[in-house]
């Protein structure tokens, strides 16, 4: 099954798992160059990047409940790209702060 075939709920669930579990687990081990370690920091960076600014100026809280299918898909893809090293998390974090 590809990301394109997933429902909005499945995409959001995958995004939450990646930012709450996968990325925080990778940060102190194989991705020590990442500037953040905590789940809420990964979520802030991903959401700010998707929204093109401070996420809470664009989405009601909690953000994950208000993501469109397209936004959830973009969030999952961005997480995957960050993990793969094809997107610079350091630069995204700077833009987000």
Predicted regions mapped to residue ranges:
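Positively charged, phosphate-engaging catalytic surfaces used for nucleic-acid and nucleotide handling
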Residues: 1-97
